[in-house]
From Swiss-Prot:
<keyword id="KW-0479">Metal-binding</keyword>
<dbReference type="GO" id="GO:0009103">
    <property type="term" value="P:lipopolysaccharide biosynthetic process"/>
</dbReference>
<feature type="site" description="Catalytically relevant">
    <location>
        <position position="59"/>
    </location>
</feature>
<comment type="function">
    <text>Involved in the biosynthesis of 3-deoxy-D-manno-octulosonate (KDO), a unique 8-carbon sugar component of lipopolysaccharides (LPSs). Catalyzes the reversible aldol-ketol isomerization between D-ribulose 5-phosphate (Ru5P) and D-arabinose 5-phosphate (A5P).</text>
</comment>
<feature type="domain" description="CBS 1">
    <location>
        <begin position="210"/>
        <end position="268"/>
    </location>
</feature>
<keyword id="KW-0413">Isomerase</keyword>
<feature type="binding site">
    <location>
        <position position="82"/>
    </location>
    <ligand>
        <name>Zn(2+)</name>
    </ligand>
</feature>
<feature type="binding site">
    <location>
        <position position="88"/>
    </location>
    <ligand>
        <name>substrate</name>
    </ligand>
</feature>
<dbReference type="GO" id="GO:0046872">
    <property type="term" value="F:metal ion binding"/>
</dbReference>
<keyword id="KW-0862">Zinc</keyword>
<keyword id="KW-0677">Repeat</keyword>
<feature type="binding site">
    <location>
        <begin position="148"/>
        <end position="150"/>
    </location>
    <ligand>
        <name>substrate</name>
    </ligand>
</feature>
<dbReference type="GO" id="GO:0019146">
    <property type="term" value="F:arabinose-5-phosphate isomerase activity"/>
</dbReference>
<dbReference type="InterPro" id="IPR046348">
    <property type="entry name" value="SIS_dom_sf"/>
</dbReference>
<feature type="binding site">
    <location>
        <begin position="75"/>
        <end position="76"/>
    </location>
    <ligand>
        <name>substrate</name>
    </ligand>
</feature>
<keyword id="KW-0119">Carbohydrate metabolism</keyword>
<dbReference type="InterPro" id="IPR004800">
    <property type="entry name" value="KdsD/KpsF-type"/>
</dbReference>
Length: 328
């Protein structure tokens, strides 16, 4: 490859905008291919009792991997198989209960062509995504999805650009259509993304991260203010609950309450905690989502809440617990 000096006045931005315009035109063409064949493909995938197995070589393989990942995270169980590996044993992962999606812009991938007779023998439904309706793969498919584009964004017409974008969008169209048909919810999505921010927000409950047992700072209503301050210091949550031996809640006292008392002045040494506590306290139930507890704390401008069943104290949740859990 020759390495020439940059042409004077070459406009990178204009070159980039030309790519966007060409690919936009390609996607506009895609609308006509969301037709009865698309419906048939969706029906086969929806009724599939096994997996949706995606195959593709080269750039089509990269798109296929993304497609399979999108299916899997949106309610359509799916995985990718490399056609070359499939020809050397990995085809054993495919069963008659599965549906195969084979991707090739030309529709003439020799690696996929070698697999089609075996898939037919196994009676595996075959959906082919190509840019050529007259190709051998399109003719062999049970359902053909066309992703033909006017031209590639590559000025040489060689590097897959517009065609791979169209294929990716067709995959997204399949995934989202199936998602809607299944009634797939944000909670369902979170179940397959437990390590992500969305998963934490939609799955993590107060009971998963609250302080319980000896971790709960608490004193009885006959304690002095000094006793309460020692308990706050020991448990390091910036507050203490005032409750009886059965953990029935009387109130709460926080370090914010203490600061406000200093602002008021006066002798605090002989005060009982019952004189200065906030009766009741703001409470949540253990089964609510941690993100809902966060929203409550932010709306009330507080850093901790009591976790309770009625007046019965079950735990304490602090803003720092939400930070550590990645909810904030």
């Amino acid at each position: 490859m020759s390495h020439l000096a940059l042409q004077p006045g070459f406009d990178f931005q204009q070159a980039g905008k030309e790519v966007l315009e060409i690919e936009r035109e390609g996607l506009a063409e895609l609308d006509q291919y969301i037709n009865q064949h698309f419906t048939l493909a969706c029906e086969k995938m929806f009724n599939c009792t096994g997996k949706v197995v995606v195959m593709g070589m080269g750039k089509s393989g990269h798109i296929g991997r993304k497609m399979a990942a999108t299916f899997a995270s949106t309610g359509t169980s799916s995985f990718f198989v490399h056609p070359g590996e499939a020809a050397h044993g990995d085809l054993g992962m495919v069963t008659p209960q599965d549906v195969v999606i084979a991707i090739s812009n030309s529709g003439e991938s020799s690696e996929i062509a070698a697999l089609i007779p075996v898939l037919k023998r196994l009676h595996v439904p075959l959906i082919c995504i190509t840019g050529r309706p007259e190709s051998s793969m399109a003719r062999a498919a049970d359902v053909h999805l066309c992703v033909k584009v006017p031209k590639e964004a590559c000025p040489l017409g060689l590097a897959p650009t517009s065609s791979t974008t169209a294929t990716l969008v067709m995959g997204d169209a399949l995934a989202v259509a199936l998602l809607k048909a299944r009634g797939f919810t944000a909670e369902d999505f979170a179940l397959s993304h437990p390590g992500g921010a969305l998963g934490r927000k939609l799955l993590l409950r107060v009971s998963d991260i609250m302080h319980t047992g000896d971790e709960i700072p608490h004193v009885n209503k006959h304690a002095t203010l000094r006793d309460a301050l020692l308990e706050i210091t020991r448990k390091n949550l910036g507050m203490t609950v005032i409750c009886d031996e059965s953990m029935k809640i009387d109130g709460i006292f926080t370090d914010g309450d203490l600061r406000r008392m200093f602002d008021m002045g006066g002798d605090m040494r002989q005060l009982g905690i019952a004189e200065v506590m906030t009766p009741g306290g703001i409470r949540v139930r253990p089964g609510i989502l941690a993100v809902d507890a966060l929203n409550l704390m932010q709306s009330r401008h507080i850093t901790s809440v009591l976790v309770a069943d009625g007046d019965q104290l079950l735990g304490v949740l602090h803003m720092h617990d939400l930070l550590r859990a990645g909810v904030v």
